[in-house]
Curated annotation (Swiss-Prot):
One cellular component (GO) term of this entry: proton-transporting ATP synthase complex
Molecular function as annotated in GO: proton-transporting ATP synthase activity, rotational mechanism
Keyword Nucleotide-binding: no
Membrane topology qualifier: Multi-pass membrane protein
Main location per the UniProt record: membrane
InterPro entries, sorted: ATP_synth_F0_asu, ATP_synth_F0_asu_AS, ATP_synth_F0_asu_bact/mt, F0_ATP_A_sf
Pfam families on file: ATP-synt_A
Name of the protein: ATP synthase subunit a
Domain of life: Bacteria
Subunit text: F-type ATPases have 2 components, CF(1) - the catalytic core - and CF(0) - the membrane proton channel. CF(1) has five subunits: alpha(3), beta(3), gamma(1), delta(1), epsilon(1). CF(0) has three main subunits: a(1), b(2) and c(9-12). The alpha and beta chains form an alternating ring which encloses part of the gamma chain. CF(1) is attached to CF(0) by a central stalk formed by the gamma and epsilon chains, while a peripheral stalk is formed by the delta and b chains.
Amino acid sequence: MTHSPLAQFDIKKLIDIKMFGFDVSFTNSSIYMLLASILALTYFYLAFYNRKLVPSRLQVSAEIVYNLVADMLNQNIGVKGRKFIPLIFSLFIFILFCNLLGMTPYSFTTTSHIIVTFTLAILVFLMVTIVGFVKHGLRFLTLFLPHGTPLWLAPLMIVIELFTYLARPVSLSLRLAANMMAGHVLLKVIAGFTVSLMIYLKFLPIPIMVILIGFEIFVAILQAYIFTILSCMYLNDVINLH
C-alpha cells in the first residue's frame, strides 16, 4: 500500500488533540497549510521590506502577482471591487502556495482534499451572500429571478437559479480538489513507469518527466487563478445586480 498512488493523500496525525469532545488534532495537512502561509508571508516580506526605486527581481515578481489580482477584480467588478483586494489576494496566494508546495518531493498537497477546498469555497460563498444582503437588502433575492422572466415561468426559474447558486461552493471545491489529485496521481504513476523504463532506455524517460512536472506546475498556478477569478465573478453577481 505504501507504493499506491493514493498513499500520498493520506492524512496522518502528528499531535493528537481533543477539545470539547471534538478531534482537532494537528495533522500533516495542518502543517503544510501553516508552512504555505509562512512561506507566503516570508516571500512578500522579503519582496517589500526594502523597496527601491529600481525594484529587485523579487519585488517585481511580487508586484506582478499583486497586479494580477487587482486587475482580476477591476475587470470583473470595477472600482467597487477594490475594497475586496486584501481578501481575494490572500485567497489566491494561499491556494497558490499550497498547490506549489505540494509539487515538492515527499510533500503533502492540502488542496487535494475536498474538506480543505470546500472550506475555502464555503467561506467565499458566505462572504458573497453577506455582501449581497448588506449592499442590497431583500433586493438581493432578485438575483434568483432574471429580469424579463414571464410570470408563469417564475417559480421554475427561481428553483433553477437557487439550485445553481447553492451548487457554487460544491463545484468550486470539487474542481480544485479533483484537478490537484488527478495531476499528482498521474505524476506518481508515470514516475513509477519512468524508473522501470530507465533500465532499458537509460535516461530517455527523464525529459518526459521534466515536461510533465512543468505541466503540473502550470496546472497548480492555473487552478489557483481559476478559483480566484470565479470568486470574483460571484462577487460581481451580487455587487452589480442585473
